UniProtKB/Swiss-Prot annotation:
Membrane-spanning parts: 5-25, 41-61
Pfam families: Phageshock_PspG (PF09583)
Protein name as it appears in the record: Phage shock protein G
Key words of the record: Cell inner membrane, Cell membrane, Membrane, Stress response, Transmembrane, Transmembrane helix
Domain of life: Bacteria
The encoding gene: pspG
Task of the protein: Effector of the phage shock response.
Gene Ontology BP annotations: phage shock
Subcellular location: Cell inner membrane
One of the record's GO cellular component terms: plasma membrane
InterPro entries tied to this protein: Phageshock_PspG (IPR014318)
Induction annotation: Up-regulated in response to filamentous phage secretin protein IV. Induced by PspF and negatively regulated by PspA.
Topology in membrane: Multi-pass membrane protein
Length: 80
């Protein structure tokens, strides 16, 4: 809701100052893109602890459930 009020206020202020309609539309597109990128950055920062937790859980599960290779099937011996 606050974003909508910002866009409407931005539009009105550009009209009052005498900017052309094409300039207003261009400014609204640029402002929308900047607000979108800012929102995505804020969301990424907000979710970062959960993403790190998910990575840690996967790492622990892979460490616990590592495939056990029998000694006779290892491929680290010399080949002739």
């Amino acid at each position: 809701m606050l974003e909508l009020l910002f866009v409407i206020g931005f539009f009105v202020m550009l009209m009052v100052t005498g900017v052309s309609l094409l300039g207003i539309i261009a400014a609204l597109v640029v402002a929308t893109a900047i607000m979108f990128l800012g929102g995505m950055l804020a969301l990424m920062i907000k979710l970062l602890p959960w993403l790190l937790l998910a990575i840690a859980v996967v790492w622990v599960i892979k460490a616990i459930k590592a495939p056990k290779v029998p000694k006779y099937q290892r491929y680290d011996r010399w080949r002739y």
